[in-house]
Curated annotation (Swiss-Prot):
Protein name, as recorded: Oligoribonuclease
Subcellular location: Cytoplasm
Residue numbers annotated as active site: 129
Source organism (scientific name): Haemophilus influenzae (strain PittGG)
EC number per UniProt: 3.1.15.-
Length: 182
């Protein structure tokens, strides 16, 4: 194990929709990497129980996607509350990264952060205030060097752990083909 303030916390949430005032978290996963994007540990992958009423109100895209990937069934079978999932995630992170050291890392991570602030505030407070958002590089590449976008394809399973792994690979791809640090 390598507890280090340079380690990066990667997180992804799946939600019932995009509005944190109306929607809720249904899955959370985390991965810790070192500063060079080498995976050190995968945290718990947790389906968060939500009511049938809330699940039935999801839009067509969410219904289709989360049915096809099995997430709705996992959510229905889960007994975990958002608070329990938050505490399990924090227990994992405390073994790898000190509080306030890592930016929140992922793709379109500001959206996840909005839900964390509302439903998992202790976890939201664990991160540094900065964001490491892979989608920023994708947007810049689309404008400045669009040809490199064709070299990275996502699976788009919309399962939290898969999405994090893809985000890490995507950042490594941009580091090699767009940023060229060598």
């Amino acid at each position: 194990m390598s507890f280090d303030k340079q380690n990066l916390i990667w997180i992804d949430l799946e939600m019932t929709g995009l509005d944190p005032e109306k929607e809720r978290i249904i899955e959370i996963a985390t991965i810790v990497t070192d500063k060079n994007l080498n995976i050190l540990a995968e945290g718990p992958v947790l389906a968060v129980h939500q009511s049938d009423e809330l699940l039935n109100k999801m839009n067509d895209w969410c219904q289709k996607t989360h049915s096809e990937n099995g997430l709705i069934e996992r959510v229905k079978a889960s007994k975990l509350t958002e608070r329990a999932a938050e505490l399990q995630t924090l227990d994992f992170l405390k073994k790898w990264v000190p509080k306030g050291a890592s930016p929140i890392c992922g793709n379109s991570i500001a959206q996840d952060k909005r839900f964390l602030v509302k439903y998992m505030p202790d976890l939201a407070d664990y991160f540094h205030y900065r964001h490491l958002d892979v989608s920023t590089l994708k947007e810049l590449a689309a404008r400045w060097k669009p040809e490199i976008l064709e070299g990275f394809k996502k699976e788009n399973t919309h399962l939290a752990l898969d999405d994090i792994r893809e985000s890490i690979k995507e950042l490594a791809y941009y580091r090699e083909h767009f940023m060229k640090l060598d």
